Amino acid sequence: MREKMAEATETQASETSTRGRPKTRVGIVTSNKMQKTVVVTVQRRAPHPKYGKIMSLREKYKAHVEDHDYPKKITINEGDRVRIAETKPASKDKRWRVVEVLEKSKNV
């Protein structure tokens, strides 16, 4: 019995010790009014679990931007299309960082 438990814990430890790639999302910046932070809205389409109808779902993520200082130096504007990646928690609700700006907004 103990041998089986030891084997199980060894396999769990080996599986969790390897890290995969961080999750990435592409979305539109909806707010840039914070220092070093932007709010990114990510839209996705998914079927309803019971009825199967395709729904449009959206989630908002707070993402960290190192060189963005709101009143003085704005590097990312509202409407910009950005790629964000998952990272370690930077604050209470910031767990994403901006990797790159894919497309600048046209109404600057």
UniProtKB/Swiss-Prot annotation:
Quaternary structure, from the entry: Part of the 30S ribosomal subunit.
Gene3D superfamilies reported in the protein's UniProt record: Nucleic acid-binding proteins
User: What protein family is recorded?
Assistant: Belongs to the universal ribosomal protein uS17 family.
Quote the InterPro entries the UniProt record gives. Answer: NA-bd_OB-fold, Ribosomal_uS17, Ribosomal_uS17_bact/chlr
Protein species of origin: Myxococcus xanthus (strain DK1622)
A GO cellular component term found in this entry reads: cytosolic small ribosomal subunit
Keywords associated with the record: Ribonucleoprotein, Ribosomal protein, RNA-binding, rRNA-binding
Q: Which GO terms describe its biological process?
A: translation
Please state what the protein is called. Answer: Small ribosomal subunit protein uS17
* Function description: One of the primary rRNA binding proteins, it binds specifically to the 5'-end of 16S ribosomal RNA.
Q: Does the keyword RNA-binding apply?
A: yes
Q: Name one GO molecular function term.
A: rRNA binding
Ranges for region Disordered? 1-26
